C-alpha cells in the first residue's frame, strides 16, 4: 500500500517515481535505522515525556535528512554505481535523473529540515550544521578511506546530541554514551551492507570496512555490536533506566546473535538480510526506553 501510494505520485508528474527512488522513499529501512535511536534520545532527553513538537521535529527531520543523504550519495557515486550490480539501475546511474536535479533536491530537503530546526533553540541550530556537513561528506569518503562507515555512524548519530540540546540545552555525559553506542552500531550494520557489494567494490576501487576487516568481518561486527550494547548499558545507568530498558537490550543482543549466525556462509543475500534485521534491534531498544518510563 505504501509503495502504491508513492507510485501514484506519477499521476502528478511523470518523473515523480524517479525522484522517489533517488531519495529512497521507496525503501524506508534507512529511515527506521535512523529513526529508532533518534526517538530513543528524544524520549530520554525528555525524561520519558518529550514534547509533541520535539517528536514531530525529529521524526520529520529523520525522514528529510535521510532522503537528502541518499540524494548526495547517489550524486557522489553516479560514475561508479553503473559498475555495481545492485546499484546499476539507480536514477542517476541510469540517466533518469540529472546530477543538477539531484543537487537541487538535496538542497530543498536540507532547507526544509533547517526550517524544522529553527523551531528549537540556538544551540540545536548550530549543531545542525554538523549534521549537514557529515551527510554531505560521507559518500565521498569511500574514495579516500576504508572507514566511510565511521563517518556514516557519526552522521546517523548526530540527532542524539541535538535531541538533548533541543530538550534542555545541556549535553550530559550520558548523551555522548548514546552517541558512541549508535556510532558503533551503525558501523556494524553498514559493514554488513558493504559486504553485499564487496566483490564489486574491490574491482572498482571503492573502500569500506567490509574490505578492511576481510575474513574477520563478522567477528568485528559482533564485537562492535557488543560494545554498543555496553555503552547503552552505561548510558542507561546514568539516566536511571531499569528493567524494561534492559529487556530491550537483551532483545537487541538476540538480534545480533542471529545476524552473526545467519551470515556464516557470507553470501550476499544473508548479509543484506542481516543489515535489514538491525531495524528490529533499534526498535526493541526504543520500546524498552518507552516502556521503562511509562511503567514506572
Curated annotation (Swiss-Prot):
The keyword Metal-binding does not apply. Belongs to the UbiA prenyltransferase family. GO terms for cellular component: plasma membrane. This is 4-hydroxybenzoate octaprenyltransferase. The lineage of its organism: Bacteria, Pseudomonadati, Pseudomonadota, Gammaproteobacteria, Pseudomonadales. Pfam families: UbiA. It comes from Pseudomonas putida (strain ATCC 47054 / DSM 6125 / CFBP 8728 / NCIMB 11950 / KT2440). GO terms for biological process: ubiquinone biosynthetic process. Its EC number is 2.5.1.39. It comes from the Bacteria.
Amino acid at each position: 500500500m505504501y509503495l502504491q501510494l508513492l507510485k501514484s505520485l506519477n499521476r502528478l508528474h511523470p518523473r515523480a517515481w524517479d525522484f522517489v527512488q533517488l531519495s529512497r522513499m521507496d525503501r524506508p529501512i534507512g529511515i527506521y535505522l535512523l529513526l529508532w535511536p533518534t526517538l530513543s534520545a528524544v524520549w530520554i532527553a525528555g525524561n520519558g515525556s518529550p514534547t509533541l513538537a520535539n517528536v514531530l521535529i525529529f521524526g520529520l527531520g529523520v525522514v528529510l535528512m535521510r532522503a537528502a543523504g541518499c540524494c548526495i550519495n547517489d550524486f557522489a557515486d553516479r560514475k561508479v554505481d553503473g559498475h555495481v550490480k545492485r546499484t546499476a539501475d539507480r536514477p542517476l546511474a541510469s540517466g533518469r535523473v540529472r546530477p543538477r536535479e539531484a543537487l537541487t533536491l538535496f538542497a530543498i530537503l536540507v532547507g526544509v529540515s533547517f526550517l524544522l530546526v529553527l523551531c528549537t533553540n540556538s544551540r540545536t541550530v548550530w549543531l545542525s550544521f554538523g549534521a549537514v556537513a557529515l551527510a554531505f561528506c560521507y559518500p565521498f569518503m569511500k574514495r579516500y578511506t576504508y572507514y566511510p562507515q565511521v563517518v556514516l555512524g557519526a552522521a546517523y548519530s548526530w540527532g542524539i546530541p541535538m535531541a538533548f540540546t533541543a530538550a534542555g540545552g545541556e549535553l550530559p555525559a550520558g548523551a555522548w554514551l548514546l552517541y558512541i553506542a549508535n556510532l558503533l552500531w551503525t558501523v556494524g550494520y553498514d559493514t554488513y551492507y558493504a559486504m553485499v557489494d564487496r566483490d564489486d567494490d574491490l574491482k572498482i576501487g571503492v573502500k569500506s570496512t567490509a574490505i578492511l576487516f576481510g575474513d574477520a568481518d563478522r567477528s568485528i561486527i559482533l564485537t562492535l555490536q557488543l560494545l554498543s550494547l555496553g555503552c547503552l548499558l552505561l548510558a542507561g545507568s546514568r539516566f536511571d533506566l531499569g528493567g524494561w530498558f534492559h529487556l530491550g537490550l537483551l532483545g537487541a543482543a538476540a538480534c545480533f546473535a542471529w545476524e552473526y549466525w545467519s551470515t556464516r556462509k557470507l553470501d550476499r543475500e544473508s548479509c543484506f538480510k542481516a543489515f535489514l534485521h538491525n531495524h528490529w534491534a533499534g526498535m526493541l531498544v526504543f520500546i524498552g526506553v518507552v516502556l521503562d518510563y511509562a511503567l514506572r
